[in-house]
């Protein structure tokens, strides 16, 4: 797959590099980094994943999605200047949103292929949702159910 194909829904600024780059996976866990991965650096309440950028670059990742400038992290990595020029860096306002959009693109926008039915009310929601699921399955449709009694996908109940 080509990174550019994953970027259609994403609002980003290309800091450096080439979005016509081969990609295989989008990650946010630096321990899963490697060639072909897009690392999305998110700032959390305890950890700022931007600090793991030298690690993901060492592991072979060459595509970074960041929320802020990463000059210090690039200086800290063990790549020579020529290799650093090969890194593609995308800046976004919200890394979590970027991760969601990149993941959706990676898997072919599965939500666009789903029909969602919501049931609200005071009484009868569980009965109604199970009836809808039964009718859909009788019509040959695949149906899942998420409710207060659990999650049902096909015959699997959690």
Feature locations, PLM:
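Phosphate-binding loop of NTP-binding sites
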Residues: 7-10, 97-158
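N-terminal leader/targeting and accessory segments in enzymes
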Residues: 1-101
């Amino acid at each position: 797959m080509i990174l550019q194909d994953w970027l259609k829904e994403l609002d980003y600024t290309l800091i450096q590099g080439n979005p016509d780059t081969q990609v295989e996976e989008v990650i946010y866990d630096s321990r899963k980094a490697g060639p072909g991965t897009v690392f999305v650096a998110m700032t959390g309440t305890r950890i700022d994943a931007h600090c793991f950028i030298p690690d993901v670059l060492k592991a072979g990742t060459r595509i970074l999605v960041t929320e802020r400038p990463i000059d210090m992290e690039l200086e800290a990595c063990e790549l020579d200047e020529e290799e650093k020029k090969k890194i593609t860096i995308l800046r976004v306002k919200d890394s979590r949103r970027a991760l969601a959009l990149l993941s959706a693109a990676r898997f072919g926008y599965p939500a666009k292929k789903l029909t969602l039915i919501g049931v609200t009310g005071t009484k009868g929601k569980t009965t109604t949702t199970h009836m809808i699921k039964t009718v859909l399955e009788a019509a040959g449709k695949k149906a899942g159910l998420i409710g207060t009694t659990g999650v049902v996908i096909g015959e699997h109940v959690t």
